[in-house]
């Protein structure tokens, strides 16, 4: 967090990754380097899958997923909506996740079957189910088909609810859901694992419910393409919007 705070507001050079909208900065690289240096000392036997450096296979059943700066575009533009995301996976099941928002000094944390916290205090999803009052976040990866994105957003706009948001920092969206600030998140195909795996566990441990895009309840795992909401009722409503033939 200190590295990101140090560079926030500065003009940084960009290195393009997959598309013009997908890039990294000196802040991404240095943040990841610092995190990895700590992990390799504290948990040297674990595998590591980090956003910039890729995969380090130590033959362990545990893998640490590292997103050193989720919301790079916001960061570069001087928008204080970004976070650091770290999760621990055991045999493809997420068992712990932490997301840190350095500007607000917020640490969201969860362990499987132990609940979720914000700065050490328990948090829970809200109980809003009135479709006119729900806020929906929609996250799609850089490789998600544009026509698919356009269709879903158009369907959401035509539906009657409070608001649709895309904060450009998917990890933090799960924190908003977990702390009762929003009601639902749609995560589409192509979203990177660093952007959702820790947040998904935090939301679920705060009481959120999950459903895959085919309408089936889905346990916490590393797969993308799902709906997670404050209730099963909200999930079913969102599912009916993005799958109109299922209404």
Where do the protein language model's features map onto the residues?
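Short loop/edge segments at beta-strand edges and connector loops
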Residues: 50-52, 120, 168
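An extended, acidic
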Residues: 125-247
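Residue-level signal for inorganic ion chemistry
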Residues: 4, 28, 39, 72, ...
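DPxDG-like acidic metal-binding loop motif
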Residues: 58-117
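N-terminal subdomain of lithium-sensitive/metallo-dependent phosphomonoesterases centered on the IMPase/IPPase/PAP
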Residues: 1-69, 247
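A short, compositionally biased
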Residues: 10, 82, 110-114, 204, ...
């Amino acid at each position: 967090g200190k590295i990101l705070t140090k560079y926030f507001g500065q003009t940084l050079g960009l290195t393009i990754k997959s598309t013009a909208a997908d890039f990294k900065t000196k802040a991404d690289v240095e943040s990841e380097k610092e995190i990895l240096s700590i992990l390799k000392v504290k948990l040297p036997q674990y595998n590591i899958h980090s956003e910039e450096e890729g995969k380090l296979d130590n033959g362990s059943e545990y893998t640490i997923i590292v997103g050193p700066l989720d919301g790079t575009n916001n960061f570069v533009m001087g928008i204080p909506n970004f976070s650091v995301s770290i999760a621990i996976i055991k045999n493809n099941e997420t068992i712990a996740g932490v997301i840190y928002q350095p500007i607000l000094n917020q640490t969201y944390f969860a362990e499987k079957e132990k609940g979720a916290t914000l700065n050490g205090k328990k948090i829970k999803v809200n109980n809003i189910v009135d479709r006119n009052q729900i806020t929906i976040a929609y996250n799609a990866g850089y490789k998600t088909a544009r026509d698919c994105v356009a269709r879903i957003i158009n369907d959401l706009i035509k539906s009657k609810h409070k608001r649709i948001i895309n904060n450009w920092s998917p990890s933090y969206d799960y924190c908003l859901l977990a702390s009762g600030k929003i009601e639902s998140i749609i995560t589409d195909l192509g979203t990177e694992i660093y952007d959702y795996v820790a947040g998904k566990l935090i939301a679920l441990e705060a009481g959120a419910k999950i459903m895959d895009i085919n309408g089936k309840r889905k346990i916490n795992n590393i797969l993308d393409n799902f709906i997670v909401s404050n209730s099963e009722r909200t999930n079913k409503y969102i599912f009916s919007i993005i799958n109109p033939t299922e209404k």
